[in-house]
């Protein structure tokens, strides 16, 4: 009886942690996901720029620049991603300008629409950003 109660408590506790960490919106977990998104966006900029050095052009999509080694961390997955109608895979929003000379990169935020007030952007300094093709606004 006591063992069964312990197992039940463990299942409930881990289930609650999983729910609050993965699905609940609002509160401290959203803030943590937003902070992680900024860190990952900053890493993604570096990976995109490295891709350009190797291939002489920006990747057409983030999938094209993903690490080939599956053991390597993928910086293009948005930790704040919420499934929206019409969205596909949980990656950051990425768009290369038709000229191929610059790109837009961001987390689209809770509304799922790019270039709105809830978007999360990379936090590069002006000096860091001027050496990249990253544009923050259209």
Question: Language-model features: where?
Answer:
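Amphipathic alpha-helical segments typified by the pilin-like N-terminal helix
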Residues: 1-39
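Low-complexity, acidic interaction segments enriched in glycine
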Residues: 35-138
């Amino acid at each position: 009886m006591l063992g069964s109660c312990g197992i039940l408590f463990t299942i409930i506790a881990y289930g609650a942690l999983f729910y609050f960490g993965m699905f609940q919106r609002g509160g401290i977990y959203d803030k943590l996901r937003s902070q992680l998104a900024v860190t990952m966006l900053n890493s993604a900029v570096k990976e995109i720029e490295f891709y350009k050095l190797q291939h002489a052009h920006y990747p057409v999509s983030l999938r094209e620049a993903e690490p080939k080694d599956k053991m390597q961390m993928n910086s293009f997955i948005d930790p704040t991603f919420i499934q929206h109608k019409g969205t596909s895979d949980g990656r950051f929003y990425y768009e290369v300008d038709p000229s191929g000379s610059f790109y837009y990169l961001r987390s689209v935020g809770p509304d799922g629409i790019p270039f709105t007030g809830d978007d999360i952007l990379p936090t590069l300094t002006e000096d860091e950003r001027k050496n990249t093709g990253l544009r923050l606004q259209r």
